[in-house]
Amino acid sequence: MKERFQNAIVADLLMTKNENGKKQILLSKRKNTGYKDGEYELPGGHLEENEDLYEAMIREAKEELGISLKRENLKIVHIMHHYTGKRMNFILETEKSDLEPRIMEVDKCEELKWVEINNLPENTMEKVKIIIGYIEKGELYSKM
């Protein structure tokens, strides 16, 4: 019997704010992880056992950014299916409002940076660039 294909589920946060009429997003610069260190990514992480997508995003935001998100303020804006990496990234958007993100995992994050959504740093992970492109076009699903 053929074994079922299994994917890891990842919740990524697209935190946005409006600065001088331009949409900005929060990026996290990786360090000491052994994977894509020195590159910017969206904050987030894998679901844990018995956790739903929103619970994972709320937990990850608290662990990585020190902020308390509410389920009703999160909206799924994109799903990326990685065939080769065997995972699915769910991108959840929230507006910054009065939240003040800060680096909580100093051993894994070198910097938090607000950037214009249409002017990402050169060293942004390729998957993030692709995801942002799809979100800007209003497309909910992509594969890589």
Segments predicted by a language model, with ranges:
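A short coil-to-beta-strand element that immediately follows conserved catalytic motifs
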Residues: 68-78
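A generic fold-level signal
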Residues: 5-8, 20, 34-35, 84-87, ...
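NUDIX/MutT-family hydrolases
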Residues: 93, 103-136
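Conserved N-terminal beta-strand and adjoining loop/helix that marks the start
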Residues: 1-25, 77-79, 93
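Conserved Nudix-box catalytic region and its N-terminal flanking loop in Nudix hydrolases
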Residues: 22-63
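Acidic/histidine-enriched, glycine/proline-rich intrinsically disordered or flexible terminal extensions
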Residues: 137-144
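Active-site-adjacent beta-strand/loop module that shapes the phosphate/pyrophosphate-binding cleft
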Residues: 8, 17, 79-102, 113, ...
